[in-house]
């Protein structure tokens, strides 16, 4: 998001932006925010939405963790693993997979910061599910490895939402 935002304010020098980055869903009206980015299907609301892309979720862990605990071959294998969950955006106790598979998870660690989840995964504390861009550098440098790729759920839409009467 930040690179696009920097490009935008460079192109429009009279625009002033107060940017808030948080790992949770905010109420734009209550918090006085003009626009936000939402990942996933949108509930009905009074907000206007513009679809701008799509992302996918991945489950990953460190090579050291996978060497010690083994690589899960199916979603059901996750019950034998230590799981780390991000609390911010998706406070759910179930993970959905392709082919309509849903499993209940019992995370050992729940963290409200995606960056901290990445740190815990790199430290070898367990497996976690994040959005692919949140772990792209770690997947590229090999400090994290994806598992259960063939079970990844469908891509999730990305929207810019804003209050009625506001435009970007």
Where are these regions (language model features)?
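Central regulatory/effector-binding core of bacterial HTH transcription factors
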Residues: 1-45
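Conserved amphipathic alpha-helical interaction elements at protein-protein interfaces in regulatory
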Residues: 11-14, 141, 166
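Solvent-exposed beta-strand sheet faces enriched in polar/charged residues
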Residues: 18-22, 147, 161
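A bilobed periplasmic-binding-protein/Venus flytrap-type ligand-binding module shared by bacterial periplasmic
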Residues: 158-168
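Secondary-structure boundary/capping motif
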Residues: 1, 28, 69-70, 168
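C-terminal regulatory
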Residues: 27, 42-155
């Amino acid at each position: 998001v930040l690179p696009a935002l920097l490009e935008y304010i460079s192109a429009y020098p009279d625009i002033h932006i107060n940017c808030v980055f948080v790992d949770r869903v905010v109420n734009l009206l209550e918090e006085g925010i003009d626009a936000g980015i939402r990942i996933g299907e949108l509930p009905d609301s009074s907000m206007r939405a513009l679809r701008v892309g799509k992302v996918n979720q991945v489950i990953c862990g460190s090579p050291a963790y996978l060497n010690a605990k083994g690589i899960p071959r199916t979603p059901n294998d996750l019950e034998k693993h230590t799981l780390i969950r991000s609390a911010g955006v998706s406070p759910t106790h179930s993970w959905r997979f392709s082919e309509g598979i849903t499993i209940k998870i019992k995370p050992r660690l729940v963290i409200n910061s995606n960056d901290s989840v990445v740190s815990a995964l790199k430290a070898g504390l367990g497996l976690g599910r994040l959005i692919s861009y949140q772990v792209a550098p770690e997947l590229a440098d090999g400090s994290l490895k994806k598992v259960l790729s063939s079970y990844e759920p469908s891509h999730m839409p990305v929207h810019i939402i804003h209050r009625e009467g506001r435009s970007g």
